[in-house]
Amino acid sequence: MSSLPVAAILPELLSALQQAPQVLLNAPTGAGKSTWLPLQILADGNIDGRIILLEPRRLAARNVAQRLAELLGEKPGETIGYRMRAESCVGPNTRLEVVTEGILTRTLQHDPELSGVGLVILDEFHERSLQADLALVLLLDVQQGLRDDLKLLIMSATLDNDRLQRLLPEAPVVVSEGRAFPVERRFAPLASHQRFAEAVAIAAADLLREEQGSMLLFLPGVGEIQRVQEQLSERVASDVLLCPLYGALPLSEQRKAILPAPAGMRKVVLATNIAETSLTIEGIRLVVDSAQERVARFDPRTGLTRLITQRISQASMTQRAGRAGRLEPGICLHLLAKEQAERAAAQSDPEILQSDLSGLLLELLQWGCRDPAELRWLDLPPAINLAAARRLLTALSALEGERLSAHGRKMATLGNDPRLAAMLTAADSADDAATAAKLAAILEEPPRGGSSDLGAAFARQQGNWQQRAQQLLKRLASRGGQPDAARMAALLAPAFADRIARRRGQEGRYQLANGMGAMLDADDALGRHEWLIAPLLLQGSSAPDARILLALPLDIDQLVAQRPELIQRSDTVEWDEAQGTLKAWRRSCIGQLVIKTQPLAKPSEAELHQAMLNGIRDKGLGVLNWTPEAEQLRLRLYCAAQWLPEADWPAVDDASLLASLEAWLLPQMTGVHSLRALKAVDLRQALQNWLPWTLRQKLDSELPTHYTVPTGSRIAIRYHEDNPPALAVRMQEMFGEATTPRIAEGRVPLVLELLSPAQRPLQITRDLSAFWQGAYREVQKEMKGRYPKHVWPDDPANTAPTRRTKKYS
C-alpha cells in the first residue's frame, strides 16, 4: 500500500464506485488523487470499459499522463494516453485517457453514449471552469437518459460539498484527511509605500535567504510575473533560477518550470493560478502567495470581456499553501494580513456566472437542449448572459428561431469559439479554408506582446499555428488550399462585423461598429489606418475604451465589394440646425459606422414627417408655435386630469407629449413639407382632435373656455398649472351673483379678479358672498369718492348687474 494519504481511503472509494453512479472525493493537495488513484481504480478491474480522466489544463493533462505511465513502466500511448487540442497520444490498448475539457465535450457530442467508457473522472472540479460545469451537466444527462451504468467520480482538493450534495443527494462523499507534509502558514501585508512588484520581490528574497529549498511565487498575471522577475533578478544569488509559468507559454517552456532545479541550484517559479492545479513542481517547499488573481468578467452589454484583479478566495489560499507541503514540510507566506484572509470569500465565483456563454449555448443547442433550465446545473447560467449569447449566435446566422440553422449545425461540429466556427464554416474554397484555419489558429493562441498587426502574424510560419491549422482543415475535410492574406478581411468580417472600427479624432482612437470606443497604443503603426477590423479586444478595468490587441487594416471599399451583405442602407431625413431646414440622406452603414452618405433629392412625406418628429424630440416642444389658445387648451387638459381624475385624460406634460407626437401631432401634418409649414400647424386643433368625443364634451362643459356672468357677457377663464382658474371681470357685471362661480362639477371655485371701471383690480376673492358682506363696504366707500357717476349699491348681491359704467349713460 502506498504512503500517499489517498491510499487510506482506496477501499472505501472502490466500494462507493460499485454502489453509486456518482461519487464525490475530497482529497487535499498532494494526496495522490491525480497521479496515483486512477491507476488503482484501473487495477481493481471492476470498471467495465475505459476510464476518461478530465484535467482542466493542457500541461497538467500531459504531466499526469506521463506520471501514470511511468508508474506502470510504460510510455504515454500504451495503457495510459492523453488527448488535447492539436495533440493526441493514444493507442489501441489505451485503457485510461487523460483529456482536456474541450476534448471531453467534443467526445460527448460525437458519441453521447460514451461507447466503451465505464468511468469519467472530473479532476480539480473546485476550479468550476465553464467547461467542467458543462461536462458535469452533460454527463448527468447521459446517465439519466442513455447510460445508467456509467460511473462518475468528481474529485478536488476543496470541493464545495454542500452544493454538490444538494445536486447529487444520493452520491457518497469520500474524504481523504491530511496533507503529505505540514505547512507553516504566515501572513504579512505588503508595505504600502512600495510598488507591488518591488514589495513582492523583497518579501520573496527575504524568505529565500532565511529558508532552504525552491519557491513557488503566485502572481495575478503575466505583467506582474515579468515585473517581479526583473526585481528579483537584482536580489537573489546566482544559484537561484527564475522560471515564469503561465498558460500562454509554450508547453516546452512550461515544462522547464516544473522540472527539478539542476544540482546545486534553487529555483523560483513565478506562476499564475495555473500552478494551483495538479502540477507537481519538483523541489518546492516555499510558497509566496500574492493573494491576488486576475479573472475575466464578461459584460453582456458590450459583448466584451473585462479583466479585473481581485483577492483570491480562502479555498484558493488553502490550495496555494498546500503546494509547499507536497514533497516535504514547507512554509507559505501569504502577502496580506490574517484578518484580511479571514474576510475573503470562502469559494471563488464559478466561471459560468461571469463568462461569455455563446459557446456554451451553441453546445447546448447541438445537444438538443433549447432551455438550459431543463438540465441539472450547480449554477444556472445567467439569463442576461444567455440573451447576449443568443444575440451573437443570431448575428452569426447560427439560429433559426430557437433551433440551430444548417450553418449553426456546421459551426457546432467544429468545437471552436462561435465566431471562429462561423468564419471557418463560411470558407467556400480550399484557399479560403486554409486562410480561415490559419486565422483561427492565431486567434486561439495569439502572439504575446510586440505588434498588434494580425497581418504580420499571419505572414509568420509558426509551428503551433501550422499544426492547429492542419487539424482544423482536417475537420473541414479541406485539402490543397494555400493561405491567402488578401482574403483575410473578407473572412474575418462576417464573424467580427461588430468589431470593424473607424478612426476618430486622435491617432490610435477608434469607434467600433457596435458603438463602443477602442484604442491602440499611441506608437502603434496600425494607428495610421482609418479602418481596421479588431477580432481581439480587451476591456480594461477602468478605461472606457477597449484595448485593441490584434487587428487588421481594412480597405473598406474592397470589403463592401466582397461582402455586400454586411452593409445596411437607410434613407433618413434630418433637421439641419445651422440652416433651419430639412435634409435627406441615403446612408450606407456597418452597424453604427457610416461608410457613405449621399444626398436624396426628394424624400417621401413619411420620411420628412419622421425627421420633423425626431427634431421636435431632440429640441423640445418649444420649436412649435404654441398660440395662447393652444396653451390654454393644454392647461385645461392638465387641470382636468387633476380635478376630474376618474376620467381617462391624456397626459400633456412635455415628456408625454413628446412621446406621443405620432398620436396627436402627426395627423395634423398632412401636406407639411417644410419647417415653415410646421410652424403653421394649429396645435389647438391638433390637441382637440386627439381627444375622444366624450372627453371633448366633458372638457367643454366642466372646464369651459369662458364663463357667462350675470350681464350675459362671456368672460375668458384663465387656467394655470399651479394656481386656481381665474376670471377677470368688472365688479358691476357681477352684481346679482350671490356666490362664487364653480367649475369641474362644482369642485373648483373660480378666483374672481373684480375690476374697477378703468379695468384695474379692486379685489381678488374666492368667496364672493363673504366679499359682498364684508370687504365690499370699504371698496364701495373708496370707489364712490373716485367714481361718483358709477353704480355702487349697498346690496350688490341683489342688485341688477350692468355693463354700463355710469348711472345715467
Go through the PLM ranges and name each one.
Residues 1-423, 538, 722-724:
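P-loop NTPase motor module signature
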Residues 111-126, 290-294, 303, 315, ...:
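Extended active-site and interfacial segments that coordinate phosphate-rich ligands
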Residues 121-122, 250, 254, 426-447, ...:
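Charge-dense polyanion-binding interfaces
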Residues 129, 349-356, 381-384, 413-418, ...:
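Structural motif
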Residues 181, 518, 583, 714-716:
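Short, isolated positions in well-ordered beta-strands
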Residues 399, 432-517, 523, 530-706, ...:
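Acidic, serine/threonine- and proline-rich low-complexity intrinsically disordered segments
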Residues 686-748:
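C-terminal accessory/binding modules appended to enzymatic or scaffolding proteins
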